């Protein structure tokens, strides 16, 4: 079952990085908040999306063991080209015309995030993407994209322009703002940050 209050949407978890700053560890399989990230994200959006996917170049069997109903795919092109490539590749697999992309390292998942992203796109018909902003910081990979964004994604990649910020500007991107008190890290970018995040959670 999916939420009937918004158009049919698929979820894609972006986990296609090289994990160089994580000492090779797959962030999606780490525990940030006493729960494996994959489970945390999957359970948060269960019943709100049609199908859940993972954009990743590794560990596909492990993902399916953790969440049996989840599906995964690799980047269309090799070379770890970043989230833009994961987004472009997704449209070859999903059937929905809207995709909610969630980075694997995000620490805070607002309860109403999907609803508010859809509302933003409905209020701004010219926009092809709405992204999350937490405590004033833009999380461009945490976004809702329309299928009509594919030509722009493809063109930017062909030109070697892999910046989400620049790409989204071409799509008339809308920011949806959230606030979270005492949030030190909105995402985890390194092994050291993960250790700090866990220590702070014990203290808070």
Predicted features along the sequence, with ranges:
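Nucleotide and nucleotide-moiety/phosphate-recognizing core
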Residues: 2-140, 147-161, 166-185, 191-192, ...
